[in-house]
Structure formats: C-alpha cells, structure tokens
Swiss-Prot record:
One cellular component term from this protein's GO annotations in UniProt: peroxisomal matrix
Residues annotated to bind 6-aminopenicillanate: D121, R310
Function comment: Nonribosomal peptide synthetase; part of the gene cluster that mediates the biosynthesis of penicillin, the world's most important antibiotic. AatA catalyzes the exchange of the alpha-aminoadipyl side chain of isopenicillin N for phenylacetic acid to yield penicillin. This step occurs in the peroxisomal matrix and the penM and paaT transporters are involved in the isopenicillin N and phenylacetic acid import into the peroxisome, respectively.
Name of the featured protein: Acyl-coenzyme A:6-aminopenicillanic-acid-acyltransferase 40 kDa form
Amino acid sequence: MLHVTCQGTPSEIGYHHGSAAKGEIAKAIDFATGLIHGKTKKTQAELEQLLRELEQVMKQRWPRYYEEICGIAKGAEREVSEIVMLNTRTEFAYGLVEARDGCTTVYCKTPNGALQGQNWDFFTATKENLIQLTICQPGLPTIKMITEAGIIGKVGFNSAGVAVNYNALHLHGLRPTGLPSHLALRMALESTSPSEAYEKIVSQGGMAASAFIMVGNAHEAYGLEFSPISLCKQVADTNGRIVHTNHCLLNHGPSAQELNPLPDSWSRHGRMEHLLSGFDGTKEAFAKLWEDEDNYPLSICRAYKEGKSRGSTLFNIVFDHVGRKATVRLGRPNNPDETFVMTFSNLDTKSAIQANI
C-alpha cells in the first residue's frame, strides 16, 4: 500500500496527495465513473448539473476542504470536478441509485480500555486504489487514515485518540445542500473527542445522503445513522458496545425509505453480537473476530464469489485506544496481503493536546 504524508496549507496538502497518488487517483476516478454511470437512470447532462451544484455548495460552505480538493486535482493533473465526484461518490452511488455493499463495525469497552474496528468490504477492483494517508495541519490533530486515493476523509484515527469508521446505508435521496459523508468523516477526524465530532456534524444542518459513521475514543463512542432528512445517534449498550453493519438500527421516521440492504447485513450483525457474547476482552480475541467466515462468502470476513458475493473484505483496521495505535491488515484479515501498525509520535500527541486547550 502506498503511504503518503502531507502537511502545510490545504492547497499544499492536496497537491502532495494528488501528485504522490496520481496513478491511484486515475483508477479511482475510472471506477467511480463506471459505478455511477452504470447504475443511474439520469442522463449525462443531469449528472453534470448535479455535480456542479455539489461543487458550488462545497466551495461556499466548506472552502478549506474545497481548497484541498483543488490541490489534489492540480497535483494529480485532473479536473477539479473529478475530485469533487470522488468525494461525493457516496451521494451519487447511494442517493441516486441502488448500490449495495457490506461493512461490519464494532466499538467495545474492555476491562483495560476500549477497542474499535472494522472490516471494510467493497468491490475488489478498488483495493489497488487504497492508500495510507497522513495529514498534518496547524492547530488540528494529526490524522492517519486508510482512504481511496483522492478522497479527503475515510477510516482512521488522530493524535487526539479519536477513531472513525464508516458503513454504507441504503436510504433513498440526495440533498445537494447537505454535508457529504466524506467531508463529515474528515470533520470527525479533525475532532478532539467523539462528542466534539458529533456536535460538528450535527451543526452542519443535515446530510446530503445516507451512511453510518462511528466515532470513538478510550472513553466514549457514538454511531451516527443519517439520511438526507434525518440523523439519529446510536449509543453503546449496557456492555459498552456498539455493533453496526449496513441496515438501519434506529427509527428515521416514515419519510426515510430504506432500499433493500444486503440480506447478509442482518446475519453479519447477529453473528458479531453472538461472537461478542463470548468475547474475553483481549486484543488478540478482538482481532480474531474479524476473521470469522460463518455464512461464507457473505461472512464478516467477506469473500468474492461469482454470482453470490460481488465484493470482498479489502482491509481490516483495529484501534487500540489505550495503546493509541491502529493495526491494518490489507486484504481479508485471515490471510492478509500486508500488515502494518499506525502510531503517533509524542510530538503529534502534544500538538493534539494543545489543539484541545
């Protein structure tokens, strides 16, 4: 996996991201274009008009993120609109068409702290577009995340100890003036606590499309289920746990229409709840949860199988909140292609504390 470290102004951060991951960004754009055009019933002209609306809203409401996106486009030698499309792919893919995928996410308090993790499942073709991105910004926590090249917010954690996960949901609708989910992920990754992340996202006045974001640290965690017309907060159960897959667990009201989540979303959720009932609280046992193949290939550790499972687990990430580290297994976690650990230096942690003062 390509590792990219960026620092400086938003434009400088974006330019370095774009130039370092130029090839991966080109492939990510090709994939996103094919996904959107292959599924939607809208015309090319309608899609281009919607993209212009999303870009204009982003430029007006979140200029710092838009500046970074412009920097990515310059570094990657692409059109700004193409990078905007990458960062609003969820809104196109799940707000306009019936795209479906699977991910499993858990937060768990333990006798010695808290653990958090995710299997990120998607089309196998996107695996080669994944990068490890580190972002250093003045006055904000340093971020380390796994993202698709060109996307400014995804799955990761920061030097303040805040970790963020992301699952697809399938509620119909797109509100161009709302907050895109990848920008919400970036906001969470720039926060010094889950509570701050929640307040930041809620204060934006609503989301553009549907998704689920989990934000946790050593002390607390929240899940945010949202659609273009609703945002619901999931809290930990009596055992200090949050489990989520790809269907709604909370009541979004009669106007929020959920569109045929993958049937295995329920089976994966139930299976993880069952596994956690016997969980002993150790880091080793928590890492093992993600290798489970019950109901293969539609399992927690998902596998591609023609005609049955169109995607696979592309990476697993486990956050150790006490140790302030994240272990990443690229590929299916029971047979990873690569394993590495993300940590922060004392200087990063000190800067994060100062940002919180």
